[in-house]
Amino acid sequence: MRIKIIYKKLGREQAHGIAESDGIIYLDPRLKGKKHFEILIHEALHLINPTDSELAIIKKSITLTKVLWSEGYRRVDDTNDEPLQDGSI
């Protein structure tokens, strides 16, 4: 399954994230840090386990977030298309 992440403000939907059955996950760009990580995992689990209840998804996403966060997993911006001060990439 291919999953595509789209960042979109979700205030009207009153949600941090939304998973659609076509493999698209919408995440609110205002999410940061651990909460962003939790919601990304949560929405991915909806796509991977579509028959799971919301409560089961919540429990799994919280557990995975806590385990991976405690192991040091973080979001890192690794884009390198902006040259450094000396002009190198």
Predicted segment positions?
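Active-site recognition of the HExxH zinc-binding catalytic motif
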Residues: 38-47
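Metalloprotease/metallohydrolase-associated module, dominated by Zn2+-dependent proteases
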Residues: 1-35, 50-89
